[in-house]
């Protein structure tokens, strides 16, 4: 059974389309109008082996906030849709990714219980034209719409680009670990309760 999500979200501020395949090969087409966000979406796809097709048109003439957030919402919804009842997955994932002097650790649980614990200390306010406070806003949107429990910890780093890119790489590898099928589970739901919540899977 294909583990795919297909979301089209339209508001007065943005028009976002996301297609996602958890069992992909890392193919990515991302056009959001926010170049640094596109670069980070490529990290999720490439290192998570998730096929992503994302197109967004938003009010970037004002700023990148609405587009950044709505892309995160749509990615979270597509992820929830692709996971369904989360039957047969490993559920938990953890990875620490270095990028030169930066080291970021991510742990996550596909629990259906949205929570973000975030401790990046990004020195600069901007990376190119991208406002670095939008990194957290992206993950807030993903978490709230996918039902992930997500912990992000910066262990080292002084270069803003390196810190953020290491974060996205660690997230992608932890997500891949958590969402891959566990052959020992034989299709069972990975919970002692026998059920996991399906936040965002509308």
Swiss-Prot record:
Q: What is this protein called?
A: Imidazoleglycerol-phosphate dehydratase
Q: What is its main location?
A: cytoplasm
Please tell me whether the keyword Zinc is annotated for this protein.
no
**PANTHER family listed in its UniProt record:** IMIDAZOLEGLYCEROL-PHOSPHATE DEHYDRATASE, IMIDAZOLEGLYCEROL-PHOSPHATE DEHYDRATASE HIS7
* EC number, UniProt record: 4.2.1.19
- Work out whether the entry's keyword set contains Transmembrane helix: no
InterPro entries given in the database record: IGPD_sf, ImidazoleglycerolP_deHydtase, ImidazoleglycerP_deHydtase_CS, Ribosomal_Su5_D2-typ_SF
Q: NCBIfam families annotated for this entry?
A: PRK00951.1-3 (NF002108), PRK00951.1-5 (NF002109), PRK00951.2-1 (NF002111), PRK00951.2-4 (NF002114)
Q: Which GO terms describe its molecular function?
A: imidazoleglycerol-phosphate dehydratase activity
Q: Name one Pfam family in it.
A: IGPD
Which organism encodes this protein? Parasynechococcus marenigrum (strain WH8102)
Source domain of life is: Bacteria
Family stated for the protein in its record: Belongs to the imidazoleglycerol-phosphate dehydratase family.
What is this enzyme's catalytic activity, as reactions?
A: D-erythro-1-(imidazol-4-yl)glycerol 3-phosphate = 3-(imidazol-4-yl)-2-oxopropyl phosphate + H2O
The biological processes this protein is annotated with in GO are: L-histidine biosynthetic process
UniProt keywords (A-Z) are:
Amino-acid biosynthesis, Cytoplasm, Histidine biosynthesis, Lyase
According to its record, what are the GO cellular component terms?
Answer: cytoplasm
Q: Supply the enzyme class, top level.
A: lyase
In which pathway is this protein known to take part?
Amino-acid biosynthesis; L-histidine biosynthesis; L-histidine from 5-phospho-alpha-D-ribose 1-diphosphate: step 6/9
Which cell locations does it reside in? Cytoplasm
What PROSITE patterns does UniProt report for this protein, alphabetically?
Answer: IGP_DEHYDRATASE_1, IGP_DEHYDRATASE_2
